[in-house]
Amino acid sequence: MEKKIWYAPNGFEAYGDEEINAVNRCLREGWLAGNGKYTTQFENEVASYFGKKHGLFVNSGSSACLLALASLNLPSGSEVITPACTFSTTVAPIIQLGYKPVFCDVELNTYVASAESVISKITPATRAIMLPNLIGNTPDWKLIRKMLDDTSRTDIYLIEDSADTMVCTPQTDISTTSFYASHVITACGSGGMVMFNEPKYLKRATMFRDWGRIGDNTELVVERFNHSVDEIKYDYKFLYACLGYNFKSSEVNAVFGVEQMKKLPKFVSIRRQNVERYLENLKDVKGIVLPSDTKNSNWLAFPIQVEDRLSLVNYLEDRNVQTRVIFSGNITRHPAYREYLQVFPNADTIMRNGILLGCHHGMTIADVDTVCRFIKEFLNLDISRVQE
């Protein structure tokens, strides 16, 4: 049987003794609840990598997206522009917070929205643009920022959902990312971060993350009891200003992430080599749509499109190559989002034909060559044989 080629890093492909030793050190030090020195270090390092001043470590990228929007305190019914080809928890917070998603299509080969398609959706009710760096490819944030600035609409925020990758995007107002186990780096299998330049948005996001409370981590009684409720002096660690959540993560997750950040350049380099190998191997193969690669992309996985997707999926999976579809395709066709149903030609094509293949840092060039060999074999076969 062929070696299993996973869609995402599996087991010790993702971590090693460095992370294990760091976690053990953290456990021996005895502080688990988060907001400790490792959380602070991790927040600072990731925020700096993204070109932001402040980071807030949370339990998932999905939570980070919700906090990104919640921190802005937009008027009810505000419109938020977002692509139809996406991930569910890029869109869900828009609706959960009482806003209206306004969908646009994506480009067929990049899987992200063009600047023109985004800006064309702006109306007087638009208050935010929330775009994913889908599969690790990035929209043209510089052009989007320029075109937005040209509209003189200073009341529209740019939010990037960078769950799938790690990039520097100073053009955006808010960035989010995810440290789920399958991503470019992981914080012990989970975690996320929301990043800001403005302290006021960080403060509000922190309140939402920490149960809605006003207080921070100080133990100074003079600060804790410097608030009153109906003339009752009250500890602001238990004084609630908004309807919050518990989206906190732990020091164990943070220290794991700190070690992963040291490996990020290596992980990115391996992924880049694997993507370039795919592109070289498949460039002359008919019947397959390859992604447009800008060299700035830091791909989570390698996307392709073929007309008979299910047959190719079966062919690859039967040969121990794990596959995925390209996330939502057109998310307005999904049961939870049917009230927004629209035809988006490119997102619909991706929904029918899209496949994700592994390109992660646990894979070798030989693994990529094996996957490409199977794809070529499949495309040279009579389809009826594959479906038997």
Task: Write out the residue ranges for each language-model feature.
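N-terminal "arm"/small-domain region of PLP-dependent enzymes with the aminotransferase-like
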Residues: M1-A33, A241, G358
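PLP-dependent aminotransferase class I/II
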Residues: K37-N44, Y49-G55, E116, A128-P132, ...
